[in-house]
């Protein structure tokens, strides 16, 4: 049973270097499943780019290099790990977030999150004065601003959203921005020279050149079946003669259907049919009689966003 991620190491690292150069001052984001590589694999690469790294939650801080300053992107909930490294920077976007830090005894540095059209975390212009006052009263120290536009939308739209904030906020603090391409970041720096604008980059950095990586699983077994038979967890009825192909990847790896319930598995550039939805560590595929059938030991391509996949093995070639 294997879900294998293969990476062309030199080409991948060349992409990292090119991306970092294009963005200028940036903070690599290493969060969640580590963009398919795992957080432990990406942290040393992030340290080559910047002395600061961004993680998704306060529970991911422990993965960051000891010498790094770590920005936590998501506000802290009811559990605040103790102790946190002194170079940790937390994020607040509401009075509730500040109260949570206060109750947890946090008096360290914070970044103020500003609302974007995504309407996730972040203070509005009207809420900002009270939030700043609450941060001061709690004994925390503001060290920056943050704006997180949505993924969708034109670059110009995202620049406009951030520009509105840049016209209002104190330029003595850096502002950290996400989901902007390098050109947009450089344009903002040109338009607002008094501000220090720092790009936070995750997907575009680690996964920006998909040609450098491939995701495969192996065929573990096959079963010849006749029309009318049943198979699988749900006793799915077989509509025609063919072969059930068992591959070593499933929901435990984060592998699911794509688009409109399409199979994520491909063999010899042909999409393979799912007999039933993937389950845990195995997916059951069906190949009608007469088609070239994958055999035990063959590798099957897996079409999945790496942001949700957990590979069993990573081959750095």
Predicted regions and their residues:
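Active-site anion/phosphate-binding pocket segments in diverse small-molecule metabolic enzymes
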Residues: 3-9, 13-16, 28, 33, ...
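Active-site-proximal beta-alpha core segment in soluble small-molecule metabolic enzymes
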Residues: 3-14, 24-168
């Amino acid at each position: 049973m294997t879900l294998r991620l293969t990476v062309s190491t030199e080409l991948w690292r060349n992409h990292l270097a090119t991306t970092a150069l294009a963005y200028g001052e940036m903070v690599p984001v290493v969060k969640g499943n580590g963009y398919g590589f795992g957080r432990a694999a990406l942290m040393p690469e992030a340290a080559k780019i910047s002395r600061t790294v961004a993680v998704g939650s306060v529970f991911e801080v422990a993965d960051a290099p000891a010498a790094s300053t770590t920005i936590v992107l998501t506000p802290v909930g009811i559990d605040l790990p103790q102790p946190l490294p002194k170079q940790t920077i937390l994020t607040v976007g509401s009075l509730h977030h500040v109260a949570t830090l206060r109750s947890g005894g946090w008096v360290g540095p914070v970044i103020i999150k500003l609302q974007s059209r995504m309407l996730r975390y972040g203070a509005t212009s009207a809420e900002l004065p009270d939030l700043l006052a609450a941060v001061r009263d709690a004994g925390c120290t503001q060290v920056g601003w943050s704006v997180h536009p949505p993924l969708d939308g034109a670059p110009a739209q995202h620049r406009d959203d951030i520009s509105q904030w840049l016209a209002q906020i104190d330029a003595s603090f850096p502002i950290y921005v996400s989901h902007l391409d390098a050109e947009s970041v450089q344009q903002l720096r040109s338009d607002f020279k008094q501000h220090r604008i720092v790009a936070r980059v995750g997907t575009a950095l680690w996964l920006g050149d998909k040609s450098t990586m491939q995701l495969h699983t192996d065929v573990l077994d096959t079963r010849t079946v006749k029309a009318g038979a049943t198979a699988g967890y749900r006793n799915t009825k077989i509509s025609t003669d063919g072969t059930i192909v068992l591959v070593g990847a499933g929901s435990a790896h984060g592998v699911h259907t794509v688009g409109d319930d399409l199979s994520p598995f491909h063999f010899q550039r042909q999409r393979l049919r799912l007999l039933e939805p993937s389950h845990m560590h195995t997916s059951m595929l069906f190949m009608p009689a007469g088609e070239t059938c994958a055999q035990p030991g063959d590798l099957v391509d897996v079409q999945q966003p790496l942001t949700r996949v957990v590979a069993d093995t990573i081959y750095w070639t």
